[in-house]
Every structure is written in C-alpha cells, then in structure tokens.
Amino acid sequence: MNDAPGIALSLPGIAVIGGGPAGLMAAETIRAAGIEVDVFDAMGSVGRKFLIAGKGGLNVTHSEARPAFDTRYRERAREVGAWLDEFDADALREWARGFGIETYVGSAGRVFPMDRKAAPLLRGWVRRLRESGVRFHLRHRWLGWDGDGRLRFDTPAGASCLHAGATILALGGGSWPQLGSDGAWVGAMSEAGIDIAPLRPSNCGFDVGWSAHLAQRFAGAPLKPVIARWHDAEGREHALQGECVLTETGIEGSVIYAISADLRETITRDGSAMLHLDLAPGRDVTRLCEALSMPRGKRSLGEWLRRQAALDAAKAVLVFEVLGSDAGNDIDRLASTIKRLPLRLLRPRPISEAISSAGGVRLGALDDTSMLRAMPGVFCAGEMLDWEAPTGGYLLQACFASGLRAGLGAVAWMQR
C-alpha cells in the first residue's frame, strides 16, 4: 500500500490514527455514515500485529455466552460490556461473513476463520475500505499536537501538521513494538493532561531464576498437562488446567498467560508471587506415594519418576530444582511436591515480549462515546485504553467493538 498523495493542511472529515483492528473498524463505521476519513499509520502497511496474531490460527472471538464473556475483562467488565452490546461475538462473525469468510468454534470455544488465516480477512477489509473512499497514509508517525491543536506527524517527506474535524486515536498498547504499537504516544498524551495508567505487560511470561542446568538444557520444554494454582488479590485460591513452557529465564505458555494479570498484580504488591503446579493431574498424593514406594533397584530417580509417576524429563527436572539431589530420600515429600510444586515468580517479562498490555488511557477520561473529556473531538479505541483480557479471542473482540464505539461517537460529533 502506498501513501495517498499530498495531505491537505485541513482534512474535511475524520482522522483515524492507527491501522489496527480498532482503527480500521472506526474508519469503516465513519465511512458508512458518509463522512470522509483518512487513516494514518506509522508502519509501511496496516494490521501488522493482526497478521502476527493469525500465525498460529486467527482467533477472532470466543463463543462463551454473555454475561460470563464480559467477566473476562475483569474490573473493566461493565465498560467493555457496553461496547459488546453494540458489537458482540455473533456480530463479529456475521461481519466476517460479509467478506465470504465463514468461522467455526474450535477447541475450548475459540472462534476461527475456516482457513484460520488473518491475511485473507485483512486484504478483503482494506480493499473494501479503499473502495469505499477511505484514504491511507502510511509511514506517518503521530507525534502529538502542536500549539494550535493540530495533529503532528513525522512522514517520509518531513514534518507535517494538519487539522481534522475529529480524531480517533487507536495507537495500540506497548507490546510488539516492532509492529508499531510501541507506546510512544504516552508522552504526548500525558503532556496534554490525559489521565493514563502505566502500561504493563499482559498475557506474559515470568522470570523464576532457574539453575544454569535447567536454563541451558530445558528452555523450550513443554509442561503438559499441569494444573496451576494461584491466589488473587483477595487471597482466594484458583486452579486452572492447561499447558506451559519452560524458558531460559522462567515460565510462559497458555495457562500462564491466562492467569498473568493476577500474578503480575501480586508481584506489584508483594515483590513476588507464588505459583504451584500439579505435575500429575488425575493422581492423588496417596496413589503417588504407593507408586513411588516400590523398590526402584538400580534405576535413576529420573527414570523412576517417569515409570511410576508418568513425569517426563521437563517435569522431573522441576522436582529436582525444588528438592535438590536428595529428592528421592523422602517419598511423602516427593509426592507432595509433585502435586504442589512451588515456584516463586520474580517479575513479569518485559512488555515488549508480552502478547498484549494493560494500562493506557483510563476509561474514566472518556465519555460514553469514547471521546476524551479533556479534548472534545478526540476519541480513543483499542488496546491503548486501560483494559485487559486473556487470549482466546477476547482481545480482538474488544478492539473491534471499541473501534465501532469510537467511530459512532466521532460520527455523532461531526453531525451535532
């Protein structure tokens, strides 16, 4: 995609800054109302993070029924729920059908396009937007506002300033900065007096501090299945079965991402967080003790754990990491550790490595149309807002829905 020629100093319609799902949905909504719209993006093409999300299969939304669906947004369930009232999972699936793309419900209720790919959907979407009259301006990095309130951009041709009838900011969070969502907008918006919660990693891994042996020999090894147990901010214990992966610095994977918000908040409050892993789901301590009490002869403890407790090498090395070389001397302790292996999580991985981010423009800084109370005519959408959700389609669903909300708000502003 090439830059549209020559940007006027004053746009007749609405400027959408950010070409991710939220920004593109806002642009579509605006154009459907007959209002001119220009989309600006810092990268050489739009939807780059959207394409990466589709690498392992594009999970566009989730089939979970509401209101349970809304609870996935934690303390922002009420506000995000209002967006979903206008564009829920069924609406998203019907929208995709408009491109000839059917969807299906896969494992654990996740919804995918039939071919599981992001590129066909993005290509069709951008084509339709262009045909409707949406103008794209690529490699235009937004820098904030000048003293006259005009939008400032760094462009291939140099600095540029322009005025628009309304502006929608859909600049993303702070994860995957190489794809455009680098969080650089925080400085400009803070200077403008916008209330912003610090950006933090979400759906992320955590550092543990392994021994050199584990870090060097078992990084990348999967742990499956396991049951993770952890405590929330109120001290309630929760359990979730799934899979995770050992890394050179700690642990990550789907079950860790799903509980990362609670773990991150505990670390913020207490300096670290305790995570317990059940390495042998389906077997109780008594049965494990009986199996491990059998004579093991000349077999190594690792081989014995594989035969008697069905622990692979990755799970066994975790047991040795916690109990040390004398792990087999106390069978009761060994069995208890297998069922509740303690890991002290030291810190979340950097936001640049996270799947998504928490924090951003506080929802209280917006009115019900997603317009900034402090800046009439400026709207916000997508991951740059202060909400978070687990993977599984919840992230994209809220981005689409918030883009629609901001688009409708900007249309109403222009038509007032």
Region spans (language model):
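A conserved short coil-to-beta-strand element within the FAD-binding core of flavoproteins
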Residues: L138-R150
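N-terminal Rossmann-like FAD-binding beta1-loop-alpha1 element of flavoenzymes
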Residues: P12-V39, A406-V411
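Glycine-rich loop(s) and the adjacent beta-strand/alpha-helix scaffold that form part
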Residues: A166-A212
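Short hydrophobic core segments
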Residues: A15-I17, F40, W142, C161-P177, ...
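Residue-level recognition of phosphate/Mg2+-coordinating polar/acidic sites
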Residues: A32-A33, S45, R66-A68, D85, ...
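An active-site-proximal "capping" alpha-helix that borders the catalytic cofactor pocket
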Residues: A26, W185-A192, Q397-Q415
